[in-house]
Amino acid sequence: LTPSFYVGSAGNISAGVIERYIESQRSQWMTMRKAFKYRLYPTKPQARDLERTLFLCRQLYNAALQERRDAYRKAGVSLTYYQQKRSLPEIRTELLEYKGVHSQVLQNVIERVDLAFQGFFRRVKHGENPGYPRFKGQGRYDSFTFPQAGTTGVKLQKDGKRVLLYGIGSVKVKLHRPLEGRLKTATVKREAEHWYIVFVCEVEPKPLPPNEETIGIDLGTNPHFLVTSEGEMVEAPRYFQKAQAKLAPAQRSLSRKKRSSNRRKEARKRVAALHRKIANQRRDFHHKLARRLVKQYGTIVHENLNIEGLARSCAAKGVQDAGWAQFLSILAYKAAEAGRRVIAVDPKYTSQACPTCGHRERRPLWVRVYTCPGCGAHLHRDVAAAQNVLARAWTGPSGVAIPCPRSPGL
């Protein structure tokens, strides 16, 4: 539909007004948010200013949390985000150190407290373990956010080599890939001894050519991270397990160091560096595998696993090392950007049923290959599970087949 169509139907409304309205709607429905993470290289004074900003934000977070607790215990009143936000100008007037922190950064701190309580009440409502919001100790508050970085607080210089941060100054940044879209927010993060900035931008999806290929995937921990319904087996990298030869001695060394000593700080940095390397390796593996699946298939089907519950089971270490939740999150956003479809299905009995005849039988986990007693099919346990996952995507709860969807073109 064009502006001229609307003008012919809407009387005296000008074409310009209609066109602006169409553009605003297109922007609202045809964009997505994408994060770009870059390494910062602050000078020593700038690093101290960044640490000071984190300290002040943590101090404000704990004070806001304490205020909410006191208000409810003493007066039975639940403070809101807006009530607490109104006190920020007074805080900046009385405590001059807070003038060096952008007002919207402080507002975001109050918003984090509010989100923590929203999560608490939601868990109470759903009968889950509530987990009352806790105070942030030293080293437990590692980021601050400029919620309107596109207009205030943050400015990326034209050469792309420095970023101007309110209260910090011009900080060297390494843009290893170009920034895309319209800048919305910026978050400065501390990871061990390194600093990063994460820009969240509003970008338009980049759909790939339509693809009718569908695939079912079964996630695992050892020996395979992922098995497809076509029989492809992706070996589990097990980065955490492989790093134990270095990580275990580093952690033992840390535990022997005297608290608050310089040697303990150095030992903590070594442990953090090893964990950061493991996380980076795992994230890189997830990104590359997800991108390959999205390029190759139009529809990807996986089990809707209770990953949080599995992370508390006897398989917890393997599940956390595999990083299923991160992989599925990356897969979902890459699929959305490329115009692909990702479907989550009920995982019940997918590893017990025969994909050929439907015969169901429990088997020990160590049994990887078996012969179905119902039809005699010789099957690999994980491949059969992936085939069941794929079949379940096109079958409704009543067993009625659902037509295989075409890949949506965003």
Q: Would you name each region that the model predicts?
A:
Residues M32-L410:
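Nucleic-acid substrate recognition interfaces
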Residues L1-T31:
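Charge-rich, low-complexity N-terminal segments
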